[in-house]
Amino acid sequence: MIYPQNFEQKIGFDQIRQLLKEKCLSTLGEERVMDMAFSDHFGEVEERLDQVTEFVRILQEEDNFPAQYFFDVRPSLKRIRVEGMYLDEQELFDLRRSLETIRDIVRFLQKSDDDEEEGASPYPCLKRLAGDITVFPQLIAKINGILSPYGKIKDNASTELARIRRELASTMGSISRSLNSILRNAQSEGVVDKDVTPTMRDGRLVIPVAPALKRKIRGIVHDESASGKTVFIEPAEVVEANNRIRELEGDERREIIRILTDFSNQLRPSISDVLLSYEFLAEIDFIRAKALFAEQISGLKPALENKQLLDWTMAVHPLLQLSLAKHGKKVVPLDIELNEKQRILIISGPNAGGKSVCLKTVGLLQYMLQSGLLIPMHERSHAGIFSSIFIDIGDEQSIEDDLSTYSSHLMNMKIMMKSCNERSLILIDEFGGGTEPQIGGAIAEAVLKRFNQKQTFGVITTHYQNLKHFAEDHEGVVNGAMLYDRHLMQALFQLQIGNPGSSFAVEIARKIGLPEDVIADASEIVGSEYINADKYLQDIVRDKRYWEGKRQTIRQREKHMEETIERYQTEIEDLQKSRKEILRKAKEEVEQLMQEANARIENTIRSI
């Protein structure tokens, strides 16, 4: 279950669809993009991801993948199911080229890797996809008998067509010779200019003449130029021949239609099978578009597990990444973990600190993953499968139902509590907001308690202290903070799991220049204990960030030392192998020299 109906618009997946459509080669792939759907079947999701991963390798490692002629001829094929209908010349040309593309793709995917065991494929998932696809070599051969390499009907497509075109060529030649003779005489008499040549008007060969001299040439006036300075005369001597040309052209058209109709009649029983092959072409176009998009966003397949899990390292919101890249900026990556011990993450921190972006990143990437798209994160990341995803973000105000923002929020909570389970992922922004804080916080805590009891997974953003305390006191729920630099007074857009975040309300108020006496009054109203607790919280987060940085530095140094030690050990092993090899070869050479010396001594003794 995906909730609400406009879930894709809320997380930005509609924009992902549009970006994918732009990478398709044809309407075949574009339809697949629009039909792309979320799946909660582990095997299906893994197969889709593996297909895209393999195609990324094709894009990176191969330069001969057949991707030239992705034509959607399905409407034409469906049209000729009706008796008497036929494919025209262009449709037949598109059919041939796209059938050749299907054939070439199947051959490409079914090839074996010479470096591996016999029959093994470098692209096993795509090979399975191409396994039962019919490639219609006889159909292609028939079309080749009709069309030239450039898509024109061949002269020898039929005996009758060859005869018609021979007569056409002969008649045209005769007319041309007659016209040239008439033209030379007219030029010698000064009726037409020296540089004038015969031209075509309404399919008939004519001579351009000045209006004042048109009576000098006996014939039929067919047309005049837009300026009125030229008329086009068909000499009487070639009228009959031109009429014959028109007759032959009609015969040619009728014979071509007969040839195309005959071919379409032969094709008609196989149309259903041919259409199945075009479904394969559509799938390849779709997978290729997903692979191109994966390259654009540095997407990959994390280690996929058949359970509910988020263990992401350096995850990135792809739309934000593309947007910032245009301005030469980079996204701050997200590290997040949800598992059986910490299923629900409560994120707190200052406004505009990245809480909502964090929540949307989780929703978008998980939805992309289960829709068969590779996602941008570190390769050591792990991901699971959820049966349903719910989101509550933004203003869902309905004029028709006269619902306020908070009423809409509560309606969403009601649906989530009713429908969620241990395989669900819930995403809630500003949990409990939109009403009086005390009761809003209480209701939010009660709802959170139900979510936890149902063992659902989720990411929730909030400012409420009671929800932070709930996370500290209950198993399955964990706090997270969006980090903030107190000295620079700016958000760092980094998520740190383990401690709640501060809203930094006092610091932000002081930064924007609120009078100190107002800040002092506010501090007195809320109480020194709250202010001190918030400061202690900030100190804890700051210290944790400091020690986390130290830990990262130590880890990097340890990794560097391990790599150095491993490199030296490898070099020592290589030296030992080289030493043994040198000694072995030296021993063999000594033995060979001894054998040769003994042989020479024996030969010398025999000769004496």
Tell what function each PLM region has.
Residues 183-201, 291-314, 378, 478:
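Long, charged, glycine-rich C-terminal linkers/tails
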Residues 135-151, 240-261:
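Extended, charged coiled-coil "arm/hinge" scaffolds of SMC/Rad50-like chromosome-maintenance ATPases
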Residues 60-67, 257, 264-268, 272, ...:
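Extended, Lys/Glu-rich alpha-helical coiled-coil stalks
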Residues 1-160, 164, 270-273, 277-283, ...:
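Conserved amphipathic alpha-helical "coupling/scaffold" segments
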Residues 196, 201-232, 242, 304-333:
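SMC-family hinge/dimerization module
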Residues 162-213:
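Extended, Lys/Arg-enriched charged tracts that mediate electrostatic binding to polyanionic substrates
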Residues 297, 305-541:
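ATPase nucleotide-binding head domains, primarily ABC-like/P-loop NTPase cores
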Residues 547, 551-608:
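Terminal-proximal interaction/regulatory segments of ATP-powered molecular machines
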